[in-house]
């Protein structure tokens, strides 16, 4: 482990950074950065300030604090960002015996967390559309795209069954990509098109706009989805000073969770702009108090 950095895959961005780890700790906090699926300036180091704030607390030593990188667009498109997150989790289960986990994600990091809660459906639809779009465009095959095999998917499900999801903290997230483009137009459509193969694919990429995920059903994370419904602590944070994302995405997410009859805790505060909110001490304290 070089400076707390370990590889969970072959790509240079398939990396985890262990800010704090003790194998005797029972609970792990995993942090997932944003950056519109494409910005190399957003990395696991985004969370240095949050980690520092958390470590001031006298009880912080009992938590493992880990952040992750994942492959970016346009090198890869959805759902490979989600697959990377899953591979990172699988790596932690298999190599560090981590089972109880809380996750906090910023911006598209929060998107990835939402996708995780229905990951099999999101992967199935995402890869299906990606393969169809790629064939139509470049006559590429499923093998060329390195779509995970059936065996890889089975092994992934086995690893995910061993995880107990405790708390998800969504920080200034994107939850409905179709509505995001409707609100902001061309500038946002540009980075979305970098990350997705077609409008159909990004419409199916999250539960809020998907035609295949039933809004009335519990999250289908795994066979223990009822436990996810009953035990997962959902926390939604939004800075009212965010210049890149208005309250609309957060309000849409709150409406969606309400339709699902799921409990959640919303927090809104003056925590600065989009790239400052996750650095704010108040946000760090909410995350720590929630896990």
Swiss-Prot record:
Pathway: Amino-acid degradation; L-tryptophan degradation via kynurenine pathway; L-kynurenine from L-tryptophan: step 2/2. It catalyses: N-formyl-L-kynurenine + H2O = L-kynurenine + formate + H(+). SUPFAM superfamilies: alpha/beta-Hydrolases (SSF53474). The active site is at residues 107, 242, 280. Its EC number is 3.5.1.9. It is an enzyme of class 3 (hydrolase). A motif (HGGXW) lies at residues 33-37. InterPro entries: AB_hydrolase_fold, BD-FAE-like_dom, GDXG_lipolytic_enzyme, KFase_ver/fungi-typ. One of its GO terms (biological process) is 'de novo' NAD biosynthetic process from L-tryptophan. Keywords: Hydrolase, Tryptophan catabolism. GO terms for molecular function: arylformamidase activity. The keyword Transport does not apply. Pfam families: BD-FAE (PF20434). The main chain amide nitrogen atoms of the second glycine and its adjacent residue in the HGGXW motif define the oxyanion hole, and stabilize the oxyanion that forms during the nucleophilic attack by the catalytic serine during substrate cleavage. Catalyzes the hydrolysis of N-formyl-L-kynurenine to L-kynurenine, the second step in the kynurenine pathway of tryptophan degradation. Kynurenine may be further oxidized to nicotinic acid, NAD(H) and NADP(H). Required for elimination of toxic metabolites. Belongs to the kynurenine formamidase family. Homodimer. PANTHER family: AB HYDROLASE SUPERFAMILY PROTEIN C4A8.06C (PTHR48081), KYNURENINE FORMAMIDASE (PTHR48081:SF33). This is Kynurenine formamidase. It comes from Debaryomyces hansenii (strain ATCC 36239 / CBS 767 / BCRC 21394 / JCM 1990 / NBRC 0083 / IGC 2968) (Yeast). The lineage of its organism: Eukaryota, Fungi, Dikarya, Ascomycota, Saccharomycotina.
């Amino acid at each position: 482990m070089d400076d707390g950095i370990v590889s969970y895959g072959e790509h240079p961005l398939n990396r985890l950074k262990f800010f704090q780890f003790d194998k005797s700790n029972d609970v792990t906090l995993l942090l997932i950065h944003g950056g519109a699926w494409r910005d190399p300036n957003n990395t696991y180091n985004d969370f240095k300030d949050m980690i520092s704030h958390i470590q001031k607390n006298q009880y912080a030593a009992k938590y493992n604090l880990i952040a992750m990188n994942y492959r970016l667009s346009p090198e890869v498109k959805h759902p490979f960002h989600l697959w990377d997150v899953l591979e990172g989790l699988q790596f932690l289960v298999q190599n560090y015996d981590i089972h109880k986990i809380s996750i906090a994600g910023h911006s598209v990091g929060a998107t990835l967390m939402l996708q995780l809660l229905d990951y099999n459906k999101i992967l199935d639809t995402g890869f299906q559309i990606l393969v169809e779009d790629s064939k139509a465009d470049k006559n590429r095959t499923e093998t060329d795209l390195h779509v995970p095999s059936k065996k890889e998917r089975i092994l992934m499900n086995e690893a995910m069954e061993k995880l107990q999801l405790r708390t998800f903290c969504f920080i200034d997230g994107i939850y409905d990509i179709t509505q995001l483009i409707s609100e902001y137009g061309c500038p946002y459509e540009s980075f979305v098109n970098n990350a997705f193969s077609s409008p159909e694919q990004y419409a199916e990429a999250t539960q809020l706009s998907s035609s295949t995920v039933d809004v009335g059903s519990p999250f289908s994370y795994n066979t223990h989805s009822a436990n996810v419904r009953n035990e997962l602590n959902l926390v939604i944070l939004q800075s009212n000073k965010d210049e890149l994302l208005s309250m609309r995405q957060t309000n849409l997410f709150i409406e969606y969770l309400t339709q699902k009859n799921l409990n959640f805790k919303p927090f809104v505060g003056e925590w600065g702009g989009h790239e400052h909110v996750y650095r704010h001490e108040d946000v760090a304290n909410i995350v720590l108090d929630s896990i």
